[in-house]
Swiss-Prot record:
Protein name: Uroporphyrinogen decarboxylase
Subcellular location: Cytoplasm
Function: Catalyzes the decarboxylation of four acetate groups of uroporphyrinogen-III to yield coproporphyrinogen-III.
Catalytic activity: uroporphyrinogen III + 4 H(+) = coproporphyrinogen III + 4 CO2
Quaternary structure (record): Homodimer.
Amino acid sequence: MAELKNDRYLRALLKQPVDVTPVWMMRQAGRYLPEYRATRAQAGDFMSLCKNAELACEVTLQPLRRYELDAAILFSDILTIPDAMGLGLYFEAGEGPRFERKADTLEAIKALPIPDPEDELGYVMRAVSTIRRELKGEVPLIGFSGSPWTLATYMVEGGSSKAFEKIKRMMYSEPMALHLLLDKLADSVILYLNAQIANGAQSVMIFDSWGGALSHSAYREFSLRYMQKIVDGLTREADGRKVPVTLFTKGGGLWLESMAETGCDALGLDWTVDIADARRRVGHKVALQGNMDPSMLYAPIPRIEEEVEQILAGFGEGTGHVFNLGHGIHQHVDPEHAGAFIKAVHEKSRKYHK
């Protein structure tokens, strides 16, 4: 593998000194870029794009050609694991992801296999190794998975949900069935992320998109407990370097201390959290990633620059901050505004790293 030329993202996650604050964007390979839309059209549909290693590599690299980003993230989807378990993932126009079959009974959950990442999910591993090779050491590659709780919401509901009625009914009336599902998912995620690391991912992130829908005690029992199991099971060193792990619960500002106790290296913050407060609470234990409101990219460029300065000042001096949005970039954002955001982070952060 080529030697890494820009490692400031990995260094910041491990709280080692950096020259400027590193920056990348969730969904940086996405529909806001015309070149992405062209490649997706060429692929035919979203999952065909994910399953073609060359095209997945192409869209991963597209934002790096435009912007001075400090990391690349694997182009894939969080629902690859449930799809590989045989639930039949498909996408409805305007409806988002759906499954042909649900995992909404104890019998259905018991029947679920744990997928082999090199077999049923081999297309993801081919994408990881292709991207890592084509990056030529320019920046590190981030691998990722959904959290067990978040994956389970789609599997029990049969797709996206606003109220989570079916899974919450299971959680409160059949908790053992849900724990069995979450345990299988945690085992699957460990295998999946370790395979990504073996194929070239230099850092991994767990997206707990729907953890914020849980009550205080339910979050610990049904989400955090299983992310803890994953952190404990991950390969933490590869290519002679530590492989940092980031946990991100959207709406998880209440639980930063508990998340920091898992042994992860960094916490993702959404835009509802004050980063200065987050650093006071957990900055001695973990690095922080975030946390500009993605909608700020609709603002005039001077306003974006002002917001970047405010977040940098909120975090303050020293390392341990990876700048990002508080969630994925929106599809209608002007690519020039994204570029101005990335440039502002590098230019305005230098004074905090003397």
